[in-house]
UniProtKB/Swiss-Prot annotation:
Keywords: Glycoprotein, Secreted, Self-incompatibility, Signal
Transmembrane segments: none
Name of the molecule in the record: S-protein homolog 27
Gene of this entry: SPH27
Major location category of this protein: secreted
InterPro entries on file: Self-incomp_S1
Localization, UniProt: Secreted
Family: Belongs to the plant self-incompatibility (S1) protein family.
Organism whose genome encodes this protein: Arabidopsis thaliana (Mouse-ear cress)
Residues glycosylated per entry: 91, 123
GO BP: any one term: rejection of self pollen
GO CC, one annotated term: extracellular region
Amino acid sequence: MINSSSKKNLISTFSSMFTICIVMIFVTCYETFQQDGEPFPIRGPLTRITVKNNNDYLLGIHCKSKDDDLGFHIHKEGELYGWKFHVNFQNSTLYFCGFSQGQDNKGVFDIDRAERDFYRCRNCTWNAKKDSLYGYSNLPQTVTWFFKWLK
């Protein structure tokens, strides 16, 4: 006959073994699951950001998050600038970008704030125009957000 203490130890052992098996299955299958050619995200869905320069001048763009500095880039009229990332588990991912025309600062704006944009778009498009920066939703392709240039 199994006493109460032995029964608890047996249940604890089986529970630990079950947990280890689940973790091993997940680790083994991790690379099998793909999303748009990327490994299955542990944190959150894959998001793509694209900024198009629709101005007749060179547009400077410098984007960052808490963890990543994407560097400064200069784009001609019609050129695209973009990157992709996974939203973090806490849904607090934030990318902000500074825009400039030569020495003129056009502004620094939150280009992707997960709490604001999580349902707005997965492929987020921003168009830099003469007066403002316009953000579009996935469907329908309508302006849902815009930032007015400082100058």
